[in-house]
Amino acid sequence: MNFRNCLLSFAAFGLVIALMAVPASAQTRVGEAAVVKNEVLRVAASSTTQIKVGDGLVRDEVVRTGRDSATRLVMADSTNLSLGPNATLKLDRTVFDDEHHYRDVAVRMTSGAFRFITGHSDKAAYKITTPLAAIGVRGTTLDILSQRGQTIVNLQDGAASVCTVTFECIQLTQPGDTAIITSGGGGRSTIKKTNNPPWTFAATCSAAAGLCSKTQYADATPVIVDDGSDPTGMLCGR
C-alpha cells in the first residue's frame, strides 16, 4: 500500500471512530426545568435521575414528581407546564417549525395536578391528553387534574375543547368553565360541564416559589443535549 492510500485509509478509519463517539441518544433540547422542589425525576427505561434547575428536556421524556415535590418546565416556545406532587408527565412528541415555535407538540398528563400555559406556537399545534381526555387549546391557561377514574379540566383563561376517548366533547369558553370526565367502566365515560369547579391548581401554587409564574424560555434556539457518555463533550452538528 503506497503512502497516499495509507493516509486515505487512516482518515476513513478516523471518521468511523469519530462518528461512533457521538452518543446515539443525543437529542434536540425542547425545554428546561425552571423550578424544582425536592424529588423531580427524569424516568428512563432502566433508571431515574434527579432533575435540577436549568437541566434540559428532550423529546419522549417522562418527568415524575414525588411527595411534597413540584416543578415548572418551560418549553422552547415558552409554554409553561407546572406539576404538583405525585405527578407524571410525558413529552410525547415535539416537532419544531422554527426555533421559536412548534408545528406539533403532544403532552400526556398521566397522573397528578398540572397547570398548562400555552406559548408562542400556533394553538392547533398543542395536543394534551390524559387517560380519559383529549384537550385542544386556544390561547389558554388550563388547570388539569388526572386521577384514576376521573379527569378535571378547569379553564383559567382563553378557550379549550375537551373530549372523551369516545369523542363526546364540550367547549370551555369562560373563566371557571370546568369539564369533569368520569370513567364508567367498560371503556365508557361520562362528561359534564360546570362553572363551579370542584378543584383548581391554585391551592398547589404555594408548593414552590415561582411554581405558577410564567417565564420565557431562556434560550429559544434548540441545542443538542448528550447523555454524558462523550468524554470530550464535543458533538457533531453544533
Q: Where are the model-predicted features located?
A:
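Structural recognition of beta-strand segments within beta-rich domains
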Residues: 31-182
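C-terminal interaction modules
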Residues: 1-28, 48-52, 76, 84, ...
